[in-house]
Amino acid sequence: MNCWIALEKKAKALRDQASDALKIVRDQYQEQQSLLNRTQELAEQYQRKLAVLQTQPAHFGDVQLYRTSLKQLQHGMFQIQQEITRLEREVTIRQRELKRTEIERQKFEKLIERERDLDRAREELKETRALDEMSVQMHFRKQNLA
C-alpha cells in the first residue's frame, strides 16, 4: 500500500504544478485582456479627437500625429489580440493537463481505498476465523464435560 501512497503524493504534486501553471496562464490572459480594453479605449479617444480635429480648422501636424498614433494603437491591439489567442490555446492545453493529472491522482486514490478495503476484509476474515475457532473449541469442551 505504501507504493500507492507514494504514487498518489507524486500525482498530487504534479496536479498542483499543473494547477499553478494554469493559474499563471490565466493571470497572463486577464492581464492581456485588460491591456486590450485600455488600448481600445485609448484608440476610441484618439478617434474622437481626430474626428473633432478634422471638422475644425487645425494644424496638419496635429492631425497627422493623431493618425500615426491611431495606427500604432491599432497595430498594438492586433498584437495583443494575437497574444490573447495564443494564451487561450495555452489555457486549453493547461486545462487538459490539469484534468489528466487529476484523473491520475484519483486513480491512485481509488487504489489506496481498494487496498484499505481489502485490508479491512482480511482483518474481518481473521476475526471471523478466530471466533469460529473459539466456538469450535468451546463446543468440544462442552461435549467433553458432558
Where would I find each of the regions flagged by the language model?
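Charge-rich amphipathic alpha-helical interaction elements
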Residues: 1-146
